[in-house]
Amino acid sequence: MPTGTIILIVSIVIILIIAYVACLIVRKRNDNLLVALEERKEELFNLPVNEEVETVKALHLIGQSQVSFREWNQKWVDLSLNSFADIENHIFEAEGYNNAFRFVSAKNAIDSIDSQIDLIEEDIASIRQGLMELKEQEEKNSGRVKHALNLFDSLQEAVRENPDSYGETLSELEKQLKNIEVEFSEFVMLNSSGDPIEASEILDKTEEHMIALNQIMDRIPSLIERVTKDFPEQLEDLESGYRKLVEQNYLFTEANIESQFQNIRVSIRENTALIVSFDLDAAEAENEGIQAKIDHLYKVFNREIEANKEAVKISKNLPKFLEHVVQNTQLLDEESQRLNATYLLADSKLSRINQLKARLESIEIVVTESVEDIENPQVAYSILEERLDHSLASLKEIEEEQLVLADYLKSQELSENTARKKATLYINKLHTLKRYMEKRNLPGIPAEFLTNFFRTSDHVEALIAELDYKRINIEVVNRLLENATYDMNQLEELAYLIVQNATLTEQLLQYSNRYRSFDESVQKAFNRSLSIFEKDFDYQAAFEEISFALETVEPGVTERFVRSYEKTREAIRY
């Protein structure tokens, strides 16, 4: 055979072999896909949907719940009887295509089967979800029913065991419980007949009513206790206390006490009506208002009781204190009259003593009447206490002012005695200073000293003249004494200074002799200083002139002489 023919035959054989192998591979892959689809179908078919359907079916649902269950059940029946059978047929058909090497038909069949299984899987998931929701709704209703029953029983038990705690609201509470019982019966009927969806709506309303009623019942006992027990007891206590206080002659700043009692009773009745109508927020606010009215009356009564105690306490000592202050004022008046004959007393002080006398007269009237009113009061004790307190405070204030006035009167004679002694002393000092200056053997007395001496003498004489008046003005005396004292001190200091300057000048002039013979500046200073000393009598200028010259030739010499003089200075002896 020709070579070309052989090559062609070999090529055809090889192509056929390759095509056959490729077909085997594709068929194997399709077989695997079909096996996987068969397994998916079996997994879906083996899901416990039948058991779940039977479980929900056993709940005996009706109404809307039953309609939903029938829809899910019918859907499952269609799937289990028709859809799975169709898939089984399609798988068998696809296997035939695959075995016959009709791969395109097999591929289309496999894709169709896969889509069918996806749809069935979604349908089964929705069926199971729907069945689960029906079951959960039923179980939820059952749990809520139990809770609702327990709550309802607890409400009934609370009313049954503690009827007094609810007072006049009891009939309304029983009415509300009866309405809830009717609603609950309707719910139980629907739930028992297998309609949990509609029953759930009824249960929601019933639970809302029970929760609201439970909250109301929790608040009512405390409100009822206040209007039926607390307030009446407090009101009875107030009325009893009021009667006792009236029997003991108590009066009050408020004239409408009994009408306030009546207003509180009316408020209690009105608040009871609010509680019965379940307007509890308003009732609580009204309770606070009632308590405030009661507290106000307690405060009024306690204030009068405490005022009585305080008034009695003050009244025991106040008359004696008043008598003491009155006596002091009389003594001040007598003393002022006695002293006014000798001294010119300040009109303001005399006027103030008279004002105190008048003020004490009015206080005495108030105290006397108030003390008498304690046994048989004409006004409330709080008013009496206020009057007595004010009187006591006024008396203390007057007593303090009396001390000031007494010190003023006492100071008249003391000031006169002091001024007379000082005047006598200053006259003696003037004579002593005069002798002191004369004994210094000075060339002359400086004009400054003479001026101060005569001014001081005039002030002392003016002081003595003021003291010689028939009626002495102590204010003027004290002012003159102050001037004389100041002048006397100044004159004494001036005398010391003049004598010191004169003595030091003489000493320095003598000391300068050691320098005059050879130091012309010292000689000139000596001459000027001596001239000032003997002719002008300006001893300070003379001292400064010679000391300056000596300091030039012998620094520190002046300070040495000054220290020495201060150690041996002669004091003025009065």
From Swiss-Prot:
InterPro entries for the chain: EzrA
Q: Where in the cell is it found?
A: Cell membrane
NCBIfam families (alphabetical): PRK04778.1-4 (NF003410)
Task: Provide this UniProt record's keywords sorted from A to Z.
Answer: Cell cycle, Cell division, Cell membrane, Coiled coil, Membrane, Septation, Transmembrane, Transmembrane helix
**Main role?**
Negative regulator of FtsZ ring formation; modulates the frequency and position of FtsZ ring formation. Inhibits FtsZ ring formation at polar sites. Interacts either with FtsZ or with one of its binding partners to promote depolymerization.
Q: What is this protein called?
A: Septation ring formation regulator EzrA
Instruction: Tell me the residue ranges located in the Extracellular compartment per UniProt.
Output: 1-7
For membrane topology, the record states: Single-pass membrane protein
Origin, by domain of life?
Answer: Bacteria
Q: Which residues lie on this side of the membrane: Cytoplasmic?
A: 27-574
Q: Tell me the GO BP annotations in alphabetical order.
A: division septum assembly; septin ring assembly
**UniProt GO cellular component terms:** plasma membrane; septin ring
Q: Which residues cross the membrane?
A: 8-26
State one Pfam family annotation: EzrA
Member of which family?
Belongs to the EzrA family.
Entry coiled-coil feature ranges: 105-189
